[in-house]
Design a protein with these regions (language model features):
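Bacterial Sec-dependent signal peptides at the C-terminal "C-region" and cleavage site
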Residues: 10, 14, 18-34
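A domain-level signal for caspase-like cysteine endopeptidase catalytic cores
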Residues: 33-85
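Catalytic cores of nucleophile-dependent amide-cleaving enzymes
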Residues: 98-102, 106-193
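Short amphipathic alpha-helix with an adjacent loop that forms part of the alpha/beta core around
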Residues: 84-92
Length: 341
């Protein structure tokens, strides 16, 4: 009898629990529903120059594309520091679901955006140093979580391991929570479709050719060099360079800058850098600069160099004697569309 009563009570309790659980499940939104209700934001981190449409087309894409459009679109931010400050100062009720970053970039010289307001470009190593030295603000705990996705649309950025580490650290909050970071490994093109006029995000494989800025070689030499450098590439370089098939291939070119400044105690300590051979010898005597160039993977003779004595203003506002070198290499890329997003 005791056993039977216990059994009856247990059956009743079990049924009651099942009913409560069923009610609870119906009242508590699923994790998927929570994520669907969270907001998204896009940062356009630059402006177009003459004959460029990268940022304007990206703006249209993230405003109008059914799948990719974001709840907010911000166009005035121009540094990683300002970006992090903005996210901290404009929190939503829930962490962001998706953060889109649109920026010019490349595997060689990183992102075309300043690290600090008014500071230097976000080269991979320099960005990582800034994070390690705690020069950038930490994201607050309510800004992101482990479900937040950050897409970085900068050409080939995802193939640079140092840049990936730096970005991951930038978007780790004060509690150590990390986002789901996606950095594009392909070339990124925002392209208007001929048939319907809509803008699509296209990812493309790319094959680079480097030359001194202002010294573009003939198309036949570019074709020959690409064929020798990439013999197994699934593309007809001759047709691509001559632009015979515009529907399948795209051409892009941009500059890779290198800047180096050395400060001297007095003007007399500065060596003479008037002649071209003196300039080249001075550049080659700078071991760290030469190491940086080697890490870029761009041959030294593919840079156009200017070397001058200058007056440099240091961190304390003092004017000091210095020598500054600026190297510019142009990279010409042949692109082949892989897929549209």
């Amino acid at each position: 009898m005791v056993i039977n009563e216990a059994f009856q009570h247990s059956v009743f309790a079990a049924c009651f629990c099942i009913m409560i659980c069923a009610v609870s499940i119906s009242l508590i939104p699923s994790k998927k529903d929570d994520l669907a209700e969270r907001k998204s934001i896009c940062f356009i981190l630059g402006e177009d120059t003459i004959e460029q449409e990268y940022y304007s087309l990206a703006t249209e894409f993230f405003q109008r594309d059914f799948a990719a459009k974001t709840d907010k679109l911000i166009k005035h931010v121009r540094s990683i520091e300002e970006l992090l400050h903005f996210l901290n100062q404009h929190p939503e009720d829930e962490p962001w679901a998706r953060i889109e970053l649109v920026v010019h970039g490349n595997v060689w010289s990183g992102l075309s955006v300043n690290i600090l307001d008014g500071g230097e470009r976000a080269y991979p190593k320099e960005l990582l140093k800034a994070v390690i030295k705690k020069q950038l603000p930490l994201l607050k705990s309510n800004v992101i979580d482990t479900n937040t996705i950050i897409n970085v649309w900068g050409c080939g950025i995802g193939t640079n391991p140092i840049m990936n580490i730096a970005l991951e650290k930038c978007f780790t909050d004060e509690l150590g929570i990390k986002v789901r970071l996606n950095s594009s490994k392909k070339f990124v093109v925002f392209k208007r479709q001929v048939n319907n006029g809509q803008v699509k995000l296209v990812q493309a494989s790319y094959w680079p050719y480097f030359f001194k800025r202002g010294y573009r070689p003939s198309e036949s030499l570019i074709v020959k060099s690409l064929q020798e450098q990439f013999p197994d590439a699934p593309i007809d370089f001759k047709s691509a360079v001559l632009h015979k098939d515009k529907s399948l291939t795209i051409q892009e070119s941009f500059h890779i800058p290198v800047s180096w400044t050395v400060i001297y105690d007095t003007k007399k300590d500065r060596p003479t850098v008037r002649k071209q051979d003196e300039k080249i010898n001075w550049i080659k005597s700078q071991k760290q600069l030469m190491k940086n160039i080697e890490e870029f993977g761009i041959p030294f003779d593919r840079y156009q160099w200017t070397v001058n004595k200058i007056k440099h203003t240091d961190d304390h506002g003092n004017t000091v004697p210095a020598i500054k070198a600026i190297g510019m290499s142009t990279v010409y890329c042949v692109l082949k569309e892989d897929r549209s997003v």
